Amino acid sequence: MNGEAICSALPTIPYHKLADLRYLSRGASGTVSSARHADWRVQVAVKHLHIHTPLLDSERKDVLREAEILHKARFSYILPILGICNEPEFLGIVTEYMPNGSLNELLHRKTEYPDVAWPLRFRILHEIALGVNYLHNMTPPLLHHDLKTQNILLDNEFHVKIADFGLSKWRMMSLSQSRSSKSAPEGGTIIYMPPENYEPGQKSRASIKHDIYSYAVITWEVLSRKQPFEDVTNPLQIMYSVSQGHRPVINEESLPYDIPHRARMISLIESGWAQNPDERPSFLKCLIELEPVLRTFEEITFLEAVIQLKKTKLQSVSSAIHLCDKKKMELSLNIPVNHGPQEESCGSSQLHENSGSPETSRSLPAPQDNDFLSRKAQDCYFMKLHHCPGNHSWDSTISGSQRAAFCDHKTTPCSSAIINPLSTAGNSERLQPGIAQQWIQSKREDIVNQMTEACLNQSLDALLSRDLIMKEDYELVSTKPTRTSKVRQLLDTTDIQGEEFAKVIVQKLKDNKQMGLQPYPEILVVSRSPSLNLLQNKSM
């Protein structure tokens, strides 16, 4: 089958039909965004590769061939593929949009979902097994080999839709084009990978037994609502431990005695993650074990569980919106915020003392013209400013330990004594563009013409790693169809976000030896401190 036949067999969705592209997440298979199809008038999801260098025809055909296979895998618990967007600078798979996110979010966002009823947990496990069993029974069998809670999506009624199966070429292209310097697999994938797959030479033997191992780990995770190996930070430690026969702990703490059908489920887990692949059961046998478990629950209990989740999610969203509206009202009216004792732990007095220094003032970017910002971006921007300034890069005169002492992101917003971006306390105090910003503004068209795709992507990576760019701004840049439009959007964002943002871009231009832009300004790019990153990770 040639590339042209593959293209014609797949429904083609033009890029310009994908309106309102919004960044959702990024994984091994590419970046996922939501969009609204201009003709269908429905929300869709788009998984697209970042094409930093032109794909060879053979590479594009391989990716399209995989998409064609996925399009044929139509089943109740498989994520439906609606078509492909195949354009020179944009290659993406368009699927149905899943409003309830992933199983990973359901299990581990305990504030949003404080309780997930047992009937629903068992239904989810049953539907995962049904979906993978269907893939294994295709001709030829379609093996997932990247089954994890992040790839198990949930529709409006919390039914399972398995995603990212059969995307080995897609993942390969994404990793080869990746901007990250990390070569080791992400810990999230290692957790679900069987030990025989740690050695590349043995991958062919693993075959159909790979997915049942992953499923066993997922089952443990669903029943415990804990992250497997959550205390281990180094993926190599996990690999060594698993290769020695260790698995996530099965005891009363991880799997309490009140779990329905506990003994049967533990037996299924232990056989599924057996060290010897030949001792692991097929998904058919797994389903035979699960079916009597499902029959013990009345149909009404599944409906009640779903309704309860929807209620708690709605309450969580309503609370967040109420808080957001309250903050915006206080900002727009320039009203000081009366914080409780817990919120005062941010140390507003320290911040007030520092706010007088020109260095600190320069490091807190404020929009020069709100017309540059979309309404949603404005809201998020002001919310971000109104929180403790850990999301911004501070001047080098402020140490990481001082920044960490200023606030705990896990709990509280700071006092409004920090800044009010709408304050009218004198135009002379408005933040002026720094050296890097002024240089970028003076070289704008030269940068647009000369900044390479690789340099652009490295800049975005660096901004993400320093938490200097918001998701909304990232998506506005990354989803533009051409290199020049991406660069223009990035420079527009630089005008708004401030000096530290601009410094990163200047540094990346220098690193990529874009000599046509010389002379460069002398700048110092401040790296974020590990202590601050730790605080932020805990808050997410």
UniProtKB/Swiss-Prot annotation:
Catalyzed reactions: L-seryl-[protein] + ATP = O-phospho-L-seryl-[protein] + ADP + H(+); L-threonyl-[protein] + ATP = O-phospho-L-threonyl-[protein] + ADP + H(+); L-tyrosyl-[protein] + ATP = O-phospho-L-tyrosyl-[protein] + ADP + H(+)
PROSITE patterns, alphabetized: CARD, PROTEIN_KINASE_DOM, PROTEIN_KINASE_ST
Modified residues ((Microbial infection) O-acetylthreonine): 149, 189, 397
Domain named Protein kinase: residues: 18-294
Presence of keyword Cell cycle: no
Activity regulation text: In the inactive state, the helix alphaC is packed against the helical, non-phosphorylated activation segment (AS). Upon activation, helix alphaC is displaced and the phosphorylated AS becomes disordered. Specifically inhibited by GSK583, which blocks NOD2 signaling by interfering with XIAP binding to RIPK2. Specifically inhibited by CSLP37 and CSLP43, which blocks NOD2 signaling by interfering with XIAP binding to RIPK2.
Family: Belongs to the protein kinase superfamily. TKL Ser/Thr protein kinase family.
Protein name: Receptor-interacting serine/threonine-protein kinase 2
